[in-house]
Amino acid sequence: MYIAGVMSGTSLDGIDVALVRIEGSGVESKVELIHFTTVPFCNDIKSEIQQALSIENSNVQLICSLNFKLGLCFANAVKEVCKEANFSLEQLDLIGSHGQTIYHQPKQDGNRIPSTLQIGEPAVIAYETNTTVISNFRTMDMAAGGQGAPLVPYSEVILYRDPSKNRLLQNIGGISNVTVIPNQQSDQNVIAFDTGPGNMIIDEVCQRLFQLSYDQNGEIAKQGRVVDEILTYCMSHPFLKMNPPKSTGREQFGEKFASELLKRFEKHSKENILTTVTMFTANSIVHHYKKFILPYYEIDEVILGGGGSYNSTLVEMLRNGLKDENCAIFIQEDIGYSSEAKEAIAFAILANETHHCNPSNVPSATGAKQSVVFGNITFPPV
């Protein structure tokens, strides 16, 4: 089957689309990446998404309209990946669309029950591409008592499980998450959870202090030094003390967190603040390894993916934090994969599993009561 995996993440960089060929299903799946592209959001759409994400500035009219606008954007992104690959849209069998997360509440808060909302209307995508769309991947896991995240461990087992090596798959997107993949002979469980911020705080600080969308290759962070009082403040966040399974998002590490941090520590230099929040991402990852993973698993390799793996300052901080742990650290490209395409490929795989009616959540990662089939299916017009 030819499947397009579509992902718009918490970093708001744009729409990632992976055109993938998949044979079979389950752990025997054969997955081939044909082409990958990122279609940037235009400034107007990005601004509307940022407004929709803000509890103070959002409204139901905006979210309703944006749902359909993003559906059209996602459909156009699918057309673009096919065009770049010289691949006929008519050959496409399926689209797996994660959508744009507007709000994610993994645990009950007062009278607010666990819930999640991703937008990007699948009916619009199906109509515009004349292709069946699988979307809304998180909701069934949450209906079964899970946190609806992380979603990608199932696909990571298919792609990265090794005959003899125990691996950690560390994704550093807007939020960071880790998947522990024991080797094929092991009887230990796959576990996965969010480790905290990835690029989200770094990007927010860059935008506010340097008028840049991100710190390219970590060049600015390389110029500063870590400020202990800022790092201590960050590392005291309650999320770091919670036991897995757990998930987080912009609600805890987004604009509000960055705004309060900058106000509290405004006396410090811009470079030092950016260096310190970069170290916060690295330290929060290392903290979770040492507390929740390394006492129970012997890890041979750590494989980094997502946009944060291109931040050499962040990667060096991670290497230093793990230098005594006797595990090799790679990025996706070192082992023949793409850091950028990883999550879009995952949603192509998850769409394929839903098409075959296979459960694809990992209850040991999400906390769900049982394995479930992900997603809603939207058919194109006859």
Swiss-Prot record:
It is an enzyme of class 2 (transferase). It catalyses: 1,6-anhydro-N-acetyl-beta-muramate + ATP + H2O = N-acetyl-D-muramate 6-phosphate + ADP + H(+). It holds the Pfam family AnmK. One of its GO terms (molecular function) is phosphotransferase activity, alcohol group as acceptor. The keyword Transferase applies. Signal peptide: none annotated. Pathway: Amino-sugar metabolism; 1,6-anhydro-N-acetylmuramate degradation; Cell wall biogenesis; peptidoglycan recycling. Its EC number is 2.7.1.170. SUPFAM superfamilies: Actin-like ATPase domain (SSF53067). ATP binds at residues 9-16. GO terms for biological process: 1,6-anhydro-N-acetyl-beta-muramic acid catabolic process; amino sugar metabolic process; peptidoglycan turnover. InterPro entries: Anhydro_N_Ac-Mur_kinase (IPR005338), ATPase_NBD (IPR043129). It comes from the Bacteria. Keywords: ATP-binding, Carbohydrate metabolism, Kinase, Nucleotide-binding, Transferase. Belongs to the anhydro-N-acetylmuramic acid kinase family. NCBIfam families: PRK09585.2-1, PRK09585.3-2. Catalyzes the specific phosphorylation of 1,6-anhydro-N-acetylmuramic acid (anhMurNAc) with the simultaneous cleavage of the 1,6-anhydro ring, generating MurNAc-6-P. Is required for the utilization of anhMurNAc either imported from the medium or derived from its own cell wall murein, and thus plays a role in cell wall recycling. This is Anhydro-N-acetylmuramic acid kinase. It comes from Bacillus anthracis. The gene is anmK.
